[in-house]
Amino acid sequence: MLIGRSPVRISFGGGGTDLPSYYEQFGGLVLSTAINKYFYTILGNRSDGRIQVISSDLRLFGNWSDLAALPALPAQSSGLEIPLAVLKDLGADLAADLFLASEIPPGTGLGSSASVCVNLLKVLTTHLRCSLSKYELAERAFNITRFGLKRHVGKQDEYAAAFGGLNYIRFGKDGSTQVEPLQLDAGVLSALQSNLMLFFTGAAHHSWDILAAQEESTRLPGGPAVEALHQVKEAAALMKEALLCGNLEHFGHLLDDAWRAKKSISSRISSSRIDHLYGVARESGALGGKITGAGGGGFLLIYAEPACQNSVRSAMQNEGVQEMAFAFDSQGAQVIVNDPFIDHDEHAGTRWTFLPLSSAAAV
């Protein structure tokens, strides 16, 4: 048996510049961190040659006689399209039960779809003894979603899930990606984590249609979306410098600047409800914030110093919005249990192994 997990992420700045329509013209960059809300895959060996996939979150399952019997990838979301796409991409004969579960609901703007894909790839390639570096893992997951499922997605989510940690990620015009882990003073990192708050707006969504419209407008030379994305990218670079200097107050104000720029990319990124909630948080003392992900719903990220947090929390509770506690994740995608004795799976390893959560995976 194999058990793997991968984190979701919160993005501070640069979102949208990780789309090919932008970075192929100008180069993109994103500042983000992985958090300790995880997607899990449990793989158990089968002796009958069949493949079974069960999603506990979506309450869906599929059972097929072998790889050749897998259905064609659906044009629209069916709930199991990501595991199907990963299995087809690997193209390897295997007989396994795959049980999928997560700590957060889908469509909440935290990059959960990318985390699903990265996690499945990590577990299945471990099972098949096909080692992938973190870069290879992230890039392959992106290609599966972008080209296999034909979804309008950027690259940042896959890299956040694969690497973990607080990263400054650059996307080159040539399609290359560079991940720079930010080495912050321990006190600064702890204060940053403490000053961030997440509130669920209650609106789950799929971001692909928003991103599709954004890509179309980004390819128009000199359009308003392009200028807004330039501002978002510049804000991300300034946020990095603020963190490295330990100037968290400036970081909070930059979040506000970046959010205002991001809203001008598309009218669908925010809503009257989101604007109202953000205004309530700001009136309660928050310095900045943003909707996580492409927009349209999901989690509202707020930056508030300790003296203001109770006021922000109380105001948001009065609005019927639930807070989700979290911490930063530094590990990224990993196999946390590799036990060949549970189901006599000789592919799982030559001996029982438990990988401590504190161990760092190799790049």
What do these predicted ranges mean?
Residues M1-G13, T17-L19, E24, V30-T33, ...:
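C-terminal nucleotide
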Residues F39-Y40, P105:
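Histidine-centered metal-chelating micro-motifs
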Residues A69-S77, G107-A114, S131:
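Short gly/ser-rich anion-binding loops that grip negatively charged ligand groups
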Residues L87-T108, R140:
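Glycine- and acidic-rich phosphate- and metal-coordinating loops
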Residues L110-K134:
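DPxDG-like acidic metal-binding loop motif
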Residues G297:
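Glycine-rich active-site/cofactor-binding loop and its immediate structural neighborhood
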